[in-house]
């Protein structure tokens, strides 16, 4: 910045023009927007003359106004650094550094009404169907190369155990050997409330969901501590919290509805609401991957959501609810018995059909479960590994597999929860957990602890020498 020949500060004056000035009176924000468009014109003109323009964003607006002696009422729209450059890169530096990727136009264009996705001149497309179409199995060529490389690395065959399986999976998923190291990573915590809470299945009041969302955003939860330890981003998404949450930096407001209905008296959700929540998960996966993340982790928050998880797992494992319904937040025997009875009552009432995954979610699922289904499908369609957390993620994975069986190519079981339903889900999915610490918290905590293990599995493929390159004699 200091070496740039010319620095330009562009401001907008919101006090200019009276109520008859077109655009200013009814839409005050048009003033800085118009100034930003003027900056774009300047940028294009400078580029045509061989000049580079850097748009600086790391400054405090009020501090800059005072430092430059600007009138206090001015809004700083842009701080630009202008000068000749040695050469222009083929693509923006943010993309080169992996900080940002250009999104396909089809991701963001809606026709006539929001949610009706269509490019000009093309028929509308369904986001879920489009996503499922792009989910493919592991690449056989890269998978074979990974196993061959494992044989040549300076270690006894099979010495790295599960890490060898994970590294081969990452290779097949990415179609590359060695595979990309899955960093940076982001944990997506979907928050939603449950109408079945009214049946007395947990000792915690429903407002704890919103309070914990605030805790996540304030950096005070266990998931924040673990994320800080492993260098992961925490992304919090309100997909169905019962109350209105204040606008807070870091919170993505994607509420489909204010909590589910009581699944013992009727469907928890409509089919349309299920699809909307799945789309929230798909779009979250797309946004996080477009932002440069190489791995996605599942997280959730919702008081009473283990009741819905037990119902989903019972449906997809064909297991007695008594065997897959756990104690969640540590309920006593009496409440545990009631919780089992509630799950049985809901399943008897709805008789959900496993062949209709949307219908199963509508009957007994949660908004965060549906959103996690979308995250898994979205991650798999982008060939990005998704590390699963606990019992709720296991339930979501069962539903996602019913929608698109090849989704499991992208799934890695981060840990085994203390919840009995999680064991049943993992067995049905055929996934082996990487960590077993009797965790039963959720929030993505188990997935976060597993992240360094997954990253290590990829790193050894890059950094461990082969017998030939190291000059080590084989057995």
Where do the model's predicted regions map?
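Short hydrophobic alpha-helices that are characteristic scaffold elements of the AMP-binding
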Residues: 47-48
């Amino acid at each position: 910045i200091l070496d740039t020949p010319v620095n330009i500060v562009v401001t907008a004056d919101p006090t200019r023009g009276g109520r008859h000035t077109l655009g200013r009176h009814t839409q005050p924000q048009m003033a800085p927007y118009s100034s930003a468009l003027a900056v774009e014109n300047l940028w294009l003109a400078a580029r045509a003359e061989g000049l580079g323009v850097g748009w600086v964003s790391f400054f405090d607006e009020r501090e800059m106004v005072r430092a430059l002696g600007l009138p206090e009422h001015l809004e700083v729209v842009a701080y630009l650094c202008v000068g000749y450059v040695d050469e222009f890169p083929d693509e923006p530096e943010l993309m080169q550094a992996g900080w940002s990727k250009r999104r396909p136009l089809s991701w963001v264009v809606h026709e006539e009404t929001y949610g009706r996705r269509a490019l000009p001149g093309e028929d509308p497309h369904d986001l879920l169907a489009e996503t499922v179409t792009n989910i493919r199995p592991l690449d056989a060529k890269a998978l074979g190369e990974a196993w061959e490389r494992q044989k040549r690395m300076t270690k006894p065959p099979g010495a790295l155990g599960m890490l060898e399986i994970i590294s081969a999976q990452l290779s097949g998923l990415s179609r590359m050997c060695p595979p990309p190291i899955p960093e940076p990573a982001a944990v997506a915590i979907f928050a939603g409330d449950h109408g079945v809470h009214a049946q007395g299945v947990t000792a915690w009041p429903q407002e704890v969901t919103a309070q914990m969302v605030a805790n996540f955003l304030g950096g005070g939860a266990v998931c924040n501590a673990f994320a800080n330890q492993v260098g992961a981003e925490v992304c919090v998404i309100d997909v169905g919290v019962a109350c209105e949450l204040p606008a807070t930096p870091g919170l993505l407001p994607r509420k489909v509805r204010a909590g589910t209905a009581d699944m013992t008296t009727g469907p928890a959700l409509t089919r349309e609401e299920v699809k909307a929540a799945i789309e929230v998960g798909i779009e979250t996966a797309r946004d996080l991957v477009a932002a440069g993340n190489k791995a996605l982790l599942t997280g959730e928050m919702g008081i009473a959501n283990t009741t819905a998880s037990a119902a989903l797992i019972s449906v997809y494992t064909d297991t007695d609810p008594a065997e897959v319904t756990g104690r969640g937040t540590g309920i006593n025997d009496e409440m545990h018995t009631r919780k089992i009875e509630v799950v049985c009552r809901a399943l008897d009432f709805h008789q959900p059909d496993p062949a209709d995954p949307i219908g199963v979610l509508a009957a007994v699922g949660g908004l965060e479960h549906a959103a996690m289904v979308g995250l898994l499908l979205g991650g798999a369609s982008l060939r990005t590994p998704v590390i699963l957390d606990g019992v709720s993620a296991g339930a979501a994975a069962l539903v996602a597999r019913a929608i698109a069986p090849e989704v499991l190519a992208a799934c890695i079981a981060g840990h085994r929860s203390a919840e009995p339903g999680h064991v049943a889900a993992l067995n049905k999915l055929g996934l082996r957990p990487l960590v077993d610490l009797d965790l039963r918290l959720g929030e993505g905590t188990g997935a976060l602890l597993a992240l360094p293990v997954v990253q290590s599995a990829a790193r050894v493929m890059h950094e461990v020498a082969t017998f030939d390159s190291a000059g080590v004699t084989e057995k």
